[in-house]
Structure formats: structure tokens, C-alpha cells
UniProtKB/Swiss-Prot annotation:
Assigned protein family: Belongs to the AP endonuclease 2 family.
Co-factor(s): Zn(2+)
CDD domains tied to this protein: AP2Ec (cd00019)
NCBIfam families, per database record: nfo (TIGR00587), PRK01060.1-2 (NF002197)
Pfam families in UniProt: AP_endonuc_2
Organism annotation: Halorhodospira halophila (strain DSM 244 / SL1)
Lineage: Bacteria, Pseudomonadati, Pseudomonadota, Gammaproteobacteria, Chromatiales
Entries under SUPFAM superfamilies matching the protein: Xylose isomerase-like
Superkingdom to which the source organism belongs: Bacteria
Protein name: Probable endonuclease 4
Amino acid sequence: MPEIGAHVSAAGGPQRAPERGGEIGCDCMQLFTRNQRSWKVKPIAPGEADAFRRARAEHGIGAVMSHASYLINLAATDPEKHAKSQTALEAELERCHQLGIELLNFHPGAHLEAGIEAGIETIAATLNAICRNHPDKTDVCLVLENVAGQGSTVGADFAELAAILERLETPERFGVCVDTAHAFAAGYELHTAAGWDAMWAAFDDHIGLNRLVALHLNDSRPPCGSRKDRHALIGRGEIGPEAFRRAVTDPRTASLPQMLETPAGPEGWAQEIDWLRGCAQGNQPDLPEIEDRNINL
């Protein structure tokens, strides 16, 4: 039985997030520990970390994953932007360490005009530098997320994530989160039973299923192979419901924390969590009727 949850708001401080997760039935959750669209970072206030840990225990939240800022580009070719990106991810790592958050999810980056090989080399070198700078933070798993393949982003193909991992000095500090909408946009045909199996076979061949630490559960508005990142409500997009039934029952994924980033909003996430939990229990519940609130994560 997987832990099932969603990306919840940390408005008012990260210690507020577990209560919000508990209110919608989360077993696990994802959050931003900082303003994800600003380079400026407020320090963790005195008592905030202890309050977060207490709230997490009180509301029965299992796995917690922080999503790093969207501004970070570890493949940036501009020296100033690259330095800011490395500093920002190091700050995210420090915050997770302080709060006791065990998973730090991030997008690898975009190579711009440098080319995919140069992008992979830069990303890996930056991650190696971060780990050397923070040898005491092995309690936080650095989680590479696959991307949809828009523009010059790195990591749409599992082989690209594998190439980054192969260049790491401390690969044991890293894991991978697969976003279903991103994988679909990148061309993995997970909407069919055969395509679902083929996707995980490819993942195992390139990366190894032992490195899979979480799933982002999102349906997709655009069709397979679109290279466009636009999430849809569970079962209401181009992927359809069967892939999500598989996600919560397939032995390869059923033990993982699985987190929603759909445009449903908190009330809708509660219904999607109930539906997924019913599927995980072997039932065949009807898809809930949910308003698309255009929440973008």
C-alpha cells in the first residue's frame, strides 16, 4: 500500500504544511520550504524546525519531499546564474537538513546552447561540488526529477538521468522521482499496459529501480510525446485512469510515496487521494467529479 499525498502549501511557514496535508488525507506530502520564484531565502526561524517535526508526527505524515526552486539551473552557462543556482540548491539542502525532510526534489537544468553532453557534465560537476561542500547532510536524499523535454532541458530521457548519475562521486546520496505527466510528454507510452511495462523496463535498464524513490502523479493535457509540461486532473487527461491504478498496485511502484501535483487544489486533491487509495485497496471506484482550478505547480 503506497503512501499517497499531494503538494501542500507552506504559507505561514513550513510547520503549517503537515496540518494542511492531514486535512486532505495525505500519508506523505511535498512542499516548498521557501518562495520558489525568488532567489531571496528567509532563514528557518527559531523554533520552526521543531514545530515542523511535531506537526508532521501529529498529523501522521510519512515521507516528506521538498521541491526546489524553479529558478535553479544546474546546467546554466552564465557564470553568475550558475553560481546562484548552486548556492540556491545548497540552501535548499540546508533547510531540509534543519527541518528533517528526507527528500529534496529538483529539475536537473537546461543546457541552453551548450549541448546535451555539456549540460550533463555541468550538472554532475555541480552536484559533486554540492556534496563535497556538505558531507554532513547525507540524511537528505537529492532527488533528480525527469522532465517533459521542453526546450533544452536535460532529463526527459532516462538515459540522460543515468548519465548524470554515472558521473557522481557519491551516487548513494541520490535518487530519482518520476513524474507521470513528464514521462508521457517525453514519449513514454504509460497510458497502455504494454507502455507502462516498457517504461519501467527502460528505467531499470538505464538507472535501476532501486534508485526510484517517489512518483509525481499527474495526468497530461497534451498528447504523448508533446514535450509540453501541462498537468491535468487524474484520469481526465490524455493518460487516463488505468496508469494511475497501476501506479498504486504495481509491485515496482506500490511501495513508493506518490504525490499529486494536479490542478485540482486542496479539495480536489482530497478526492483524488481517496480515489487512488480505493484503487490501491483493489477496488474499482468511479473517478471523482472535480473542478479544474488551474493550480500550477
